[in-house]
Amino acid sequence: NPTDFRLLIDEYHILLKAYSYRQKAVDGVLDSFRKYKSFCFMSATPISADFTPSILSDVELVEAKWDNTDTLIVKLDQTNHPYVKAANYINAYKKDGYLEINGNKSTEAYFFINSVTDIASILEYCQLGNEEVKIVCADNPSNRNKLAGYTISNSRSANKPFTFITSKSFEGADYFSETGMCFVVSNSSNTNTLLDISTDIYQIAGRIRTESNPFRNTMVHIFNSVGKRKLNL
């Protein structure tokens, strides 16, 4: 009986993002949430008022105000060939075993790319071995076929020098690394990799939880406005 329970919908902005392919499930939530003893829709990146479903228009909005907040630094790296640029960063890590930024050395790189096909291309081009990479994506036959020779992991698996993450873990997954650096890769010719700056960027920025990590609040966004999808090398 729903009236015996309280309902909490965490990361509720995903309801809007997922509506195109999970319409029945999302409608089920929106049609039934008022039946519960109480309800709460919660997110660190709430839906803009312009796009909030009308059924939520009369729900009280409570905004948490924090006394101390971190400033996110996004380093923009525009290029005609985003995957080549990502490969260059990987090769720089491999050459010296680290990437030095402002006197701090990063020994682990986290690449957020929402395309298993493109991740596989980068792995092949950079000649990365299974022991060097952690790949976090949906574990299904299609992805296993694309990533033949590589293990599909989860966020709790042991750290590797290079971690590749699809939208499966853009939200709700925590990573712990003393020197991990976040790289977001977007390609204008592959819509799967395009990000919502009001939600995705902020969610990705909070994935590495280790407070002592000097790169915790820094992110490199590799992107293009024109160019081809493939590495073509």
Tell where the protein language model's regions lie, with residue ranges:
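Conserved strand-helix element at the start of the C-terminal RecA-like helicase core
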Residues: 89-126
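Interdomain hinge/linker at the junction between the two RecA-like core domains of SF2 helicases
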Residues: 44-95
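Conserved helicase ATPase core of P-loop NTP-dependent helicases/translocases
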Residues: 134, 140-166
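A conserved SF2-helicase RecA2
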Residues: 220, 225-233
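Conserved SF2 helicase motif VI
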Residues: 189-217
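SF2 helicase catalytic motif II
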Residues: 2-38
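SF2 helicase motor core recognition
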Residues: 1-2, 43, 162-182, 203-214
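Conserved Walker B
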Residues: 11-15, 169, 188
